[in-house]
Design a protein with these regions (language model features):
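Alpha-helical, largely C-terminal catalytic domains
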Residues: 42-43, 131-134, 169
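Charge-rich, solvent-exposed alpha-helical interaction surfaces
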Residues: 65-68, 72, 76, 99, ...
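Auxiliary, metal-adjacent structural segments of Zn-dependent hydrolase domains
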Residues: 84-144, 202-210
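Long, well-structured alpha-helical subdomains associated
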Residues: 205-255
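Post-HExxH zinc-binding segment in Zn-dependent metallohydrolases
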Residues: 1-30, 183-227
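Short pre-active-site segment immediately N-terminal to the catalytic Zn-binding motif
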Residues: 150-165
Length: 255
């Protein structure tokens, strides 16, 4: 498996406007204000809240909304894209991309070998594109049906990016191994966290313990109860020579 790292400006722009995202730096709010003033309708779409633009029930007003959107979507997009603030986001993201690329290249052999050992089979021979976003705008997603990962996060601890790139890779692997619905449920996600967030992290850093690093909780809090239930079985699985992640999933699926 090969990872290539890119900065996609369009993806970066819309990700940076997401309504759940903080501002990467204080000046970014100036661009948001300008976009809102130019068209609150288009801005609502861009920030991921399109439903707020269609609260009207009058069909003629809805048509007017659609007409306004078609006229103003490009001007608002260009306003943001050409702003000095967005250019700063692009510049800082490119610097971060180099950091992530260097870290992955340093760690990829042990990371991929560890995944193959824990999965119990070789990983698919495919190329995955990693779209890098600003590290202060948290991102970690595997796009279903595509060999694409979105990634951006501050380094909360050593080799953070490597661990969570492996985490996103495993989402794809689990879907391939277990099917769409099973590969995305709480048990499979908990297995991914035990495998990458915990076991891989400890192996990469040659130290650490499960569920905590630098006094920070590791992984999703809502998965912790599942993870602790299957942890004894996981520890036994780690000692097995003939590992198969599909068999392990079946074993713990009713715990």
């Amino acid at each position: 498996m090969k990872l290539i790292f890119k900065v996609n400006k369009q993806y970066l722009l819309f990700h940076s406007l997401g309504f759940r995202q903080p501002n990467p730096f204080p000046e970014w709010v100036n661009v948001k204000d300008k976009a809102w003033k130019k068209s609150s309708l288009v801005y609502s779409f861009f920030m991921g809240r399109p439903e707020s633009a269609f609260l009207e029930t009058d069909e003629n007003k809805v048509k007017n909304i659609i007409n306004e959107f078609s006229k103003k979507v490009i001007p608002v997009f260009d306003l943001i894209k050409n702003s000095k603030e967005f250019k700063r986001i692009v510049s800082e993201t490119k610097e971060y991309k180099q950091f992530v690329t260097n870290q992955w290249n340093t760690n990829k052999n042990i990371a991929l070998e560890t995944l193959e050992e824990l999965v119990g089979s070789t990983l698919p021979k495919k190329t995955v594109t990693v779209l890098i976003t600003h590290p202060k705008l948290h991102n970690g997603v595997h796009f279903l049906g595509k060999n694409i990962i979105g990634w951006g996060h501050e380094e909360d601890w050593k080799n953070y990016s490597t661990v969570y790139l492996a985490h996103e890779i495993m989402h794809s692997i689990m879907i391939e191994k277990l099917g769409l619905s099973t590969g995305r449920n709480g048990i499979s996600h908990s297995i991914i966290e035990l495998m990458t967030d915990n076991e891989l992290r400890i192996r990469l850093n040659n130290s650490g313990k499960y569920f905590k690093e630098n006094n920070k909780e590791i992984g999703h809090p809502d998965l912790r109860s599942i993870e602790k239930k299957i942890l004894p079985a996981w520890k036994k699985y780690l000692k097995k020579k003939d590992k198969k992640i599909e068999k392990f999933y079946k074993k713990v699926s009713n715990i």
